[in-house]
């Protein structure tokens, strides 16, 4: 740094900070109107940092069973429930240290033998020798808004049961997504197939669910909107 720059920094530190912040804000506004959301994401990353801690962090060194029940699950396992279980499980394996997931085969076998309707999650956990059960109840699921738009919709209630608690099985954590929709204004169905959009929506939904257990980037939503061209 030159002598002039050092003198300027000593005399005008606050003014310089304001100039930098205002400059970044102005640049962000200009870029947002041009549709370059990834660039905004980078500005925000530099200004604020990236990670938010997990609300629930008691899965380390635990044997965890994940079960998802949808509107169709009363008749047995379905593709939607299977996809949600798989995606959430993959996120936990990637980010939670020393977690052990009960295999889906083992969970499905227990549920097949004991019934899919009115499931008892604590009994399930005991049956598969789990320390934790993550129960995901999914309803109102859809990926369409009329005949011309794709819009993902879902209601989710997620509950964590702690079976190894000193006082016996307890509810350790709950999380709800009520009438969750993405993208907010929909997306023309002509721009992607049903399968392509559903894969993207489920990945986003399950990432939101996994954020309850793993630290995550505070600006994930910007990236998703940019990918969809919002």
Q: What residues fall within each predicted segment?
A:
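Surface-exposed short loop/turn segments
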Residues: 114-170, 184-185
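Alpha-helix termination/capping residues and helix-transition junctions
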Residues: 30, 58, 127-130
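N-terminal segment of the mature soluble domain
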Residues: 63-135, 170, 199, 204-213, ...
């Amino acid at each position: 740094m030159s002598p002039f720059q050092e003198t300027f920094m000593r005399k005008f530190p606050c003014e310089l900070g304001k100039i930098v912040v205002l400059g970044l804000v102005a640049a962000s506004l200009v870029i947002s109107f041009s549709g370059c959301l990834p660039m905004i994401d980078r500005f925000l990353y530099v200004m604020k940092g990236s990670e938010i801690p997990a609300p629930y962090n008691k899965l380390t060194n635990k044997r965890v069973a994940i079960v998802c029940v949808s509107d169709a699950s009363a008749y047995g396992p379905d593709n939607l429930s299977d996809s949600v279980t798989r995606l959430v499980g993959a996120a936990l394996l990637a980010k939670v240290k020393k977690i052990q997931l009960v295999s889906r085969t083992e969970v499905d076998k227990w549920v097949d033998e004991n019934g899919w309707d009115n499931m008892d999650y604590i009994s399930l956990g005991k049956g598969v020798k789990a320390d934790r059960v993550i129960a995901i109840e999914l309803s109102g699921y859809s990926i369409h808004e009329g005949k011309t738009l794709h819009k993902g919709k879902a209601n989710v209630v997620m509950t964590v049961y702690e079976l190894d608690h000193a006082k016996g099985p307890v509810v350790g954590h709950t999380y709800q997504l009520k009438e969750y929709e993405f993208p907010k204004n929909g997306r023309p169905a002509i721009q992607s197939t049903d399968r392509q959009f559903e894969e993207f929506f489920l990945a986003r939904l399950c990432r939101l669910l996994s954020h309850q257990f793993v630290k995550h980037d505070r600006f994930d939503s910007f990236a998703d909107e940019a990918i969809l061209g919002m």
